């Protein structure tokens, strides 16, 4: 049995009860759906409802789009998902990995080419 009070979870009693009760109430189809994290290509409500939510996905991997559209899509999915979704995006070179109008910074090789350890530190901190 996994100890949910320890790293990396650090859940309190109420959170653990929510996890256990939620898991018990899930159908086999819902449990299988949690294994999938599809790429979100559209913010269209019909698409999100049919393709994403009807399959009980465990999360979504976003590709670049306008920040407001990404936020609207994410909010819609979280509000309509029975279980909170995990979120993924390619953020190796900054916020532009999810939002085209996000802040861009150099990739790891570009930072290494500067020879400046402070730049590397700042990249790691972000």
Model-derived regions: residue spans:
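Enzymes and membrane/adaptor proteins characterized by extended Gly/Ser/Thr/Asp/Glu-rich
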Residues: 41-126
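Preference for extracellular/luminal or secreted protein segments
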Residues: 1-56
């Amino acid at each position: 049995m996994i100890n949910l009070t320890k790293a990396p979870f650090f859940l309190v009693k109420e959170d653990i009860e929510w996890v256990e009760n939620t898991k018990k109430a899930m159908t086999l189809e819902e449990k299988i759906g949690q294994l999938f994290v599809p790429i979100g290509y559209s913010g269209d409500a019909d698409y999100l409802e049919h393709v994403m939510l009807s399959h009980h996905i465990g999360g979504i991997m976003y590709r670049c789009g306008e920040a407001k559209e990404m936020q609207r899509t994410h909010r819609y999915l979280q509000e309509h998902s029975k279980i909170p979704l995990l979120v993924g995006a390619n953020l190796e070179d900054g916020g532009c990995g999810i939002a085209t109008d996000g802040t861009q910074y150099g990739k790891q090789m570009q930072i290494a080419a500067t020879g400046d350890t402070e730049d590397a530190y700042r990249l790691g901190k972000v």
